[in-house]
């Protein structure tokens, strides 16, 4: 309660008119011990006797009552000026490198602060503490940065702080197994298939989230034409299928392709179709 002690005491009658001033309502906080705020609200100062300094209404000393000067309204309550702030470490280091002829910068003058005002030093210390907490995080590891990101030409374009993107490489067997599993599941992972998904990931040695990303990236590419994928798989399994059907030109296989033993063509004669001559192109 330092601001209450600033109320000056002037001699005079205890009725509140001594020294040309008048004492108003009581400003004592009766709930300060409990961490709250409660005032008596007794109004103007009412002494018990002419020589008493205690209020007969609330029992508080006259210093707890707000004093209003005669003819002048009560002004705002002021705190005492805070002590000058101590120089920071970087200021002290700077003063060590300055020549002796250059004086150190003087601290700004301290003015009286109004009621409920917060010193600027408190904001400065709070900002410094916040910056210290932000800079105390664990820095990233050096192996997260690739040599291509040092010049700012990496895929992330973040300069030296661009994180190198890790790409998983799959074997052909893993790709084929993942494609078969994705087609079996309809290129989507249901919640009821978590057990089968975990077992499949353990079998092929691929992590769960890696398989999900692969299915998401190849869904439109492989699932758009399932017939072509099946035909391609059949061609890989039986590469000799489809050879020898038709004329058999350049393959060394005889036969007319009608299934009988002779080499004669039993198909009906085809009508000769004359192709029209191309029209001349004018330049």
UniProtKB/Swiss-Prot annotation:
Keyword Translocase carried by entry: no
BP term (GO), one: regulation of DNA-templated transcription
Biased composition (Acidic residues): 257-266
Gly residues composition-biased segments: 148-161, 244-256
GO CC terms, sorted: nucleus
Keyword field contains Iron-sulfur: no
UniProt-annotated site: Required for DNA-binding, residues: 215
Subcellular location: Nucleus
Keywords associated with the record: DNA-binding, Homeobox, Metal-binding, Nucleus, Transcription, Transcription regulation, Zinc, Zinc-finger
InterPro entries tied to this protein: Homeodomain-like_sf (IPR009057), Homeodomain_ZF_HD (IPR006455), ZF_HD_homeobox_Cys/His_dimer (IPR006456)
A GO molecular function held by the record: transcription cis-regulatory region binding
Zinc finger map (ZF-HD dimerization-type): 23-68
DNA-binding residues (ranges): 163-226
Main subcellular localisation: nucleus
Biased composition (Low complexity): 269-283
Chain residue ranges for the region called Disordered: 131-171, 244-283
Coiled coil: none
Recorded superkingdom: Eukaryota
Assembly and interaction partners: Homo- and heterodimer with other ZFHD proteins.
Comment text on domains: The homeodomain differs form the typical one by having namely 4 instead of 3 extra amino acids inserted in the loop between helix 1 and helix 2.
Function: Putative transcription factor.
Protein name: Zinc-finger homeodomain protein 8
């Amino acid at each position: 309660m330092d601001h209450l002690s600033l109320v000056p005491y002037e001699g005079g009658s205890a009725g509140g008119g001594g020294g040309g001033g008048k004492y108003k309502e009581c400003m004592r906080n009766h709930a300060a011990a409990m961490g709250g705020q409660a005032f008596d609200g007794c109004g103007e100062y009412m002494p018990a006797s002419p020589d008493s300094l205690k209020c007969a209404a609330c029992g508080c000393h006259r210093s707890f009552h707000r004093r209003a000067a005669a003819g002048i309204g009560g002004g705002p309550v002021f705190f005492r000026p805070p002590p000058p702030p101590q120089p920071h470490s970087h200021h002290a280091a700077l003063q060590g490198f300055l020549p002796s002829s250059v004086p150190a910068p003087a601290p700004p003058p301290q003015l009286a602060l109004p009621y409920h005002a917060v010193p600027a030093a408190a904001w400065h210390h709070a900002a410094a503490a916040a910056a210290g907490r932000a800079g105390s995080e664990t820095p990233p590891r050096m192996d997260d940065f690739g040599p291509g990101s040092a010049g700012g030409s990496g895929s992330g374009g973040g300069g030296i702080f661009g994180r190198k993107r890790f790409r998983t490489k799959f074997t052909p067997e893993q790709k084929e197994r993942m494609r078969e599993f994705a087609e079996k599941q309809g290129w989507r992972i249901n919640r009821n298939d978590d057990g089968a998904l975990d077992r499949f990931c353990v079998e092929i040695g691929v992590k769960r989230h890696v398989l999900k990303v692969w299915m998401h990236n190849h869904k439109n590419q492989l699932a758009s034409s399932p017939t072509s994928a099946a035909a391609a798989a059949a061609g890989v399994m039986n590469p000799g299928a489809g050879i020898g059907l038709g004329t058999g030109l350049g393959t060394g296989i005889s036969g007319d392709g009608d299934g009988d033993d002779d080499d004669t063509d039993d198909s009906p004669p085809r009508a000769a179709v004359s192709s029209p001559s191309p029209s001349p192109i004018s330049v």
